[in-house]
């Protein structure tokens, strides 16, 4: 359903094949949550004990769970332009993005109190962050995707620098 909706909005590349929970279990080589398990406890246990083998469908070169900076920016635009999405959907998406806990990319060098709603992406050798900086002149859309990284830390640092430069240019 989500891929049909994305295609209807004109997204030619963006595809989603699983939710975050499914991807985590896939990463750990587990197809699903065991019946009767507490999902949070099971995810915590898997993350602490599972070997880091990157062969699941999240890493397959099949065009699944992919997007482009252009399409991600178009999606962000839908969140800031009133009337493009139902208000309830827009408000809920922005609320989730404002609570993003990964802070080592776009927000890293922003001054305290600067509002940012963003979504990160990470797999070995790839770092992404796409977000909306809410600045006095108006919202600024920022999308940074880096790949083929020898150092994931260097990729995160580059995106953090982009966040700083965008803030300086538009604040």
Q: Which residues make up each language-model segment?
A:
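Mid-domain, small-residue-enriched loop/turn segments at the edges of structured enzyme/sensor domains
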Residues: 1-76
């Amino acid at each position: 359903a989500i891929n049909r909706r994305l295609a209807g909005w004109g997204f030619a590349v963006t595809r989603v094949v699983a939710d975050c929970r499914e991807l985590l279990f896939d990463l750990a080589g587990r197809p699903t949550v065991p019946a009767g398990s507490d999902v949070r406890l099971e995810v915590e246990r898997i993350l602490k004990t599972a070997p880091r083998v990157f062969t699941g469908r999240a890493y397959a070169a099949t065009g699944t769970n992919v997007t482009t900076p252009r399409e991600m920016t178009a999606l962000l635009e839908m969140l800031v332009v009133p009337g493009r999405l139902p208000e309830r959907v827009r408000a809920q998406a922005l609320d989730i993005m404002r609570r993003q806990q990964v802070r080592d990319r776009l927000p890293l060098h922003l001054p305290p109190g600067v509002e940012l709603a963003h979504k990160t992406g990470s797999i070995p050798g790839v770092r992404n962050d796409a977000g909306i900086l809410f600045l006095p002149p108006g919202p600024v859309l920022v999308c940074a995707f880096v790949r083929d990284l020898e150092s994931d830390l260097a990729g995160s640092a580059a995106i953090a620098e982009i966040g700083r430069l965008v803030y300086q240019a538009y604040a």
